[in-house]
């Protein structure tokens, strides 16, 4: 049938993405790495990055082993869980780790080649950096969809059809597939937190001793922490960001598929149910094809200005977005999904919310606009006012993204439900579809994102290898472009986490249905005396059954705990960076003291020691925050039951979302306020205002690169853990 033919688009698109990723990687490897000095520096960075990843995967491996044993006991011993969970969990984690690894490997090979290309022209530098970033983007979407289509085909073949309720089968398939999202989430959390602590310990350490105390510029080869700093860009911004978005991407598609299956559970219409399940996968598949077109369209003139560069990247992204809108209408019409026009509009809503969040992030954090320029000016009265203004700016900047998400939630709910607030099943499906729409162009948005650290490293390479001022000027242009795109990318990651979190929250109820069925609960006795069969219960029925109202103390307790989790998690990651940076500062000072001739350039600093300190610090510090995130939903479920978990997830989602935007934007603005001064405003480099903004930038580092981004994962991971543990919560909760 037409539907099954359309479904094959999904695996085909994913394989195509991987082929193009391989092609771009090959093209990049053909380019020259430049002078012997450049090659040497690139090799040192690559070695540091790989040794860090090896360590990180060891720790993640141990955690995964523990969790798999736990899941196996629950699945095969107590039968409170689906038998596929332990295996699905492992594949999710494996593919998430693989995409980070491949993206990072490409990035570490691309930086010297980008610097070398910038010796010839700006355009060739842009092309190499951007296409190497595209490897990351395409690997993430390719592996994500490959994993999804593989599991769908496998489960569809082995799960028997249910003769009584034929619509039940797809519900079981989609809820089982959701669990591999937890594998992706767990791996992503370690990548984000570990990478974030690593990169910022090195960055803060290098800045404090180098810029502030010794007065040497950034990326100066005399600074012992420079190699660690450049390794950190790859570890945090490439591997961490990739794993984060891999998880949002899979999470949104899987949650929406589960909601689609649920929306049709009490009609006998298996055909329409199948259409609703594959629609999000198809939108993602088409998004991949159009991202590839967008990637090829990015190029610029030789004597391009900053505006031209931004324009060419924006052109590629906008082209993909416009094409995806047209293609969505086409694909959903071909699919003949009920209400296809309005559901296609929900995709547009998701894309628009993403664009609004990106634009507002740019406005608040780019040095071309007033907020960041005013922030630089506040440096005239010293560092304290820079900190005060930056925190104020970050808090104010939450308004537009939050309002955008609220409008997006209401609009997509109404569009999909046929403008009927009581049609909850389809309405929630619409919210999921909006999340999928927002992430449909991930292939290219992630390419512009991974481009940032590659350009940053190219600049570091050019500086350390002593290439001319002309080359530095070009790599600086590429780099500051990267900062703007990275800020937009962060906004995107946070916005998608919020919508994905909502969709996951809704699919949690689906898991509860499956959990109750597995326990043999055939009927639900409602508080008002009615009896509803578990198989046919609606979302509203479950809310009544568990008495999920705002006045229920269990819901309220859960909400307070969820809000606290966001702050607790931020506090742990901020302190971790502070401690690790402290070790780094001590080490850099020791080297300046003990190794004679570093500052005159006669002796080479011990770069390896600094890399080792960052690696050790990140390892020590990443375990506790991650375990807390995994244990909180389990503990809440065992004590307060389903009702408490729903409260926890809502509290964590709402607080975590706003807190993440605040931290990302405050950090980005502090960073660019310092850049604005370095461009020669308010006295330029080395002046008093510059010193004040460097302090702001240093505080902003863990804000924007550790705590802020980790919150996106916390939001999704808590929902994922709740989903995987639903059977346990239903079976054994205290209250």
Residue ranges and their predicted role:
Residues 1-735:
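Hydrophobic packing and interface segments
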């Amino acid at each position: 049938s037409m539907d099954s033919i359309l479904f094959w688009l999904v695996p085909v698109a994913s394989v195509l993405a991987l082929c193009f990723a391989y092609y771009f990687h090959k093209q990049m490897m053909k380019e020259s790495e430049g002078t012997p000095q450049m090659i040497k520096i690139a090799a040192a960075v690559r070695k540091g990055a790989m040794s860090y990843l090896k360590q990180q995967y060891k720790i993640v491996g141990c955690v995964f082993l523990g969790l798999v044993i736990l899941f196996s006991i629950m699945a095969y011993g107590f039968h409170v869980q689906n038998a596929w969970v332990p295996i699905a969990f492992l594949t999710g984690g494996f593919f998430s780790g693989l995409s980070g690894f491949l993206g990072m490997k490409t990035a570490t090979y691309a930086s010297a080649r980008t610097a070398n290309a910038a010796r010839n022209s700006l355009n060739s530098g842009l092309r190499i950096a951007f296409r190497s970033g595209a490897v990351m983007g395409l690997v993430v979407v390719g592996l994500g969809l490959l994993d999804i289509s593989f599991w769908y085909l496998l489960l569809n073949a082995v799960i028997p059809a249910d003769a009584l309720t034929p619509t039940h089968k797809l519900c079981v398939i989609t809820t089982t597939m959701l669990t591999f999202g937890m594998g992706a989430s767990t791996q992503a959390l370690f990548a984000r937190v570990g990478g974030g602590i690593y990169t910022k310990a090195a960055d803060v350490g290098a800045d404090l001793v180098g810029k502030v105390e010794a007065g040497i510029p950034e990326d100066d080869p005399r600074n012992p922490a420079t190699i660690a700093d450049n390794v950190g860009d790859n570890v945090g911004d490439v591997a961490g960001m990739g794993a984060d978005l891999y998880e949002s991407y899979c999470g949104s598609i899987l949650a929406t598929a589960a909601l689609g299956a649920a929306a049709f559970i009490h009609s006998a219409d298996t055909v329409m149910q199948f259409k609703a399940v594959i629609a999000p996968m198809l939108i993602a598949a088409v998004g991949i094809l159009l991202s590839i077109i967008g990637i090829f369209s990015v190029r610029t003139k030789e004597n391009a200005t900053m505006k031209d560069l931004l324009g060419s990247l924006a052109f590629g992204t906008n082209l993909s977005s416009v094409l995806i809108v047209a293609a969505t209408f086409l694909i959903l019409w071909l699919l003949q999904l009920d209400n296809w026009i309005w559901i296609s509009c929900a995709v547009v809503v998701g894309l628009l919310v993403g664009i609004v969040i990106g634009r507002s992030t740019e406005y608040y954090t780019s040095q071309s606009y007033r907020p960041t320029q005013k922030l630089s000016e506040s440096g005239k009265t010293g560092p304290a006012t820079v900190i005060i203004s930056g925190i104020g700016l970050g808090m104010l900047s939450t308004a537009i993204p939050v309002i955008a998400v609220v409008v997006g939630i209401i609009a997509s709910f109404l569009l999909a439900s046929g403008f009927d607030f009581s049609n909850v099943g389809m309405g929630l499906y619409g919210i999921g579809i909006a999340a999928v729409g927002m992430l449909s162009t991930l292939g290219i948005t992630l390419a512009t994102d991974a481009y940032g650290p590659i350009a940053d490293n190219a600049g570091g390479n050019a500086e350390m290898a002593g290439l001319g001022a002309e080359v530095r000027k070009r790599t600086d242009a590429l780099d500051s472009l990267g900062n703007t795109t990275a800020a937009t990318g962060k906004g995107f990651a946070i916005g998608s986490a919020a919508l994905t979190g909502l969709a996951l929250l809704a699919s949690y109820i689906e898991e509860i249905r499956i959990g109750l069925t597995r326990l043999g609960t055939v009927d639900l006795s409602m508080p008002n005396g009615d009896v509803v069969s578990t198989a046919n219960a609606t979302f509203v029925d479950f809310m009544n059954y568990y008495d999920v109202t705002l006045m229920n103390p269990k819901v309220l307790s859960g909400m307070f705990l969820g809000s606290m989790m966001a702050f607790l998690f931020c506090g742990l990651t901020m302190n971790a960076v502070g401690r690790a940076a402290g070790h780094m500062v001590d080490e850099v000072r020791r080297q300046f003291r003990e190794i004679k001739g570093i500052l005159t350039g006669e002796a080479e600093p011990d770069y390896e020691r600094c890399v080792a300190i960052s690696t050790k610090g990140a390892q020590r510090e990443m375990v506790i925050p991650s375990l807390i995130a995994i244990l909180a939903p389990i503990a809440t479920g065992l004590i307060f039951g389903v009702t408490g978990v729903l409260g926890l997830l809502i509290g964590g989602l709402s607080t975590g979302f706003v807190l993440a935007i605040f931290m990302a934007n405050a950090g980005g603005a502090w960073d660019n306020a310092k850049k604005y001064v370095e461009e020669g405003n308010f006295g330029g480099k080395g002046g008093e205002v510059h010193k004040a903004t460097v302090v702001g930038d240093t505080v902003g580092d863990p804000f924007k690169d550790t705590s802020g981004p980790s919150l996106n994962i916390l939001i999704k991971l808590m929902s994922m853990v709740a989903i995987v543990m639903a059977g346990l919560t239903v079976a054994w909760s205290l209250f």
